[in-house]
């Protein structure tokens, strides 16, 4: 049996469950927070950035190493790292002439881990 992903089940009635609507409305985050959350998830919408995050999930790495790992130019990697840094997902530190990147904190690792768990569910 295959699921039809293009059809949505709908109610056959027009009953409003006001108690549930009000309960959810009271807990709903502010519009600005939801907008910021949507912007965060947009950053995860690029496979190159996901590959970079995966690499940094495993180890702190410099731009040169990430470029070799992903078979991309340093310029392309730097561009994506800039986007990730603006989204506060990665941080960097400079050691002499080498700039190392890593995930900002465990929250980023958890988002990544939860995403992988979700897509691997059967």
Identify what each model region corresponds to.
Residues 102-122:
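Conserved segment of winged-helix/HTH DNA-binding domains
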Residues 1-44:
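N-terminal leader segment of winged-helix/HTH proteins
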Residues 68, 79, 85-86:
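Alpha-helical residues within the helix-turn-helix
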């Amino acid at each position: 049996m295959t699921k039809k992903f293009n059809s949505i089940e709908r109610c056959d009635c027009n009953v409003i469950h006001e108690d549930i609507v009000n309960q959810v409305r009271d807990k709903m985050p502010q519009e600005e927070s939801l907008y910021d959350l949507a912007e965060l998830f947009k950053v995860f919408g690029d496979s190159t950035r996901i590959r970079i995050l995966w690499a940094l999930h495993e180890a702190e790495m410099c731009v040169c190493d990430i470029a070799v790992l992903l078979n991309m130019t340093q310029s392309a990697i730097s561009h994506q790292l800039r986007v990730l840094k603006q989204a506060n997902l990665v941080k960097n530190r400079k050691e002499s002439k080498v700039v190392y990147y890593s995930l900002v904190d465990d929250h980023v690792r958890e988002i990544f881990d939860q995403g992988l768990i979700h897509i691997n569910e059967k």
